[in-house]
């Protein structure tokens, strides 16, 4: 039980450092960019599969 308490403490300290250190804003901006990149890749993949006449695998 002490092991899990220490693990939770370490995770909380790391989250606090990242949250109050300004890295969170940078990571959020990076995540937004990645979201739109992968959204475009999804649309391209769907269009290519539709043009080839292949349906989605079930």
Swiss-Prot record:
**Keywords in alphabetical order:** Cell membrane, Membrane, Transmembrane, Transmembrane helix
Which InterPro entries did the record assign?
Answer: DUF1328
The record lists the membrane-crossing segments as 4-24, 28-48
Q: Is-annotated flag, keyword Transmembrane helix?
A: yes
Q: Name one GO cellular component term.
A: plasma membrane
Which subcellular locations apply to this protein? Cell membrane
Protein name, per record: UPF0391 membrane protein Maqu_2901
Q: What is the organism field in this record?
A: Marinobacter nauticus (strain ATCC 700491 / DSM 11845 / VT8)
């Amino acid at each position: 039980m002490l092991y899990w308490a220490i693990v939770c403490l370490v995770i909380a300290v790391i989250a606090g450092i990242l949250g109050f250190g300004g890295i969170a804003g940078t990571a959020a901006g990076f995540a937004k960019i990645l979201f739109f990149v992968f959204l475009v890749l999804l649309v391209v993949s769907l269009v290519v599969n539709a043009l080839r006449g292949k349906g989605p695998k079930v």
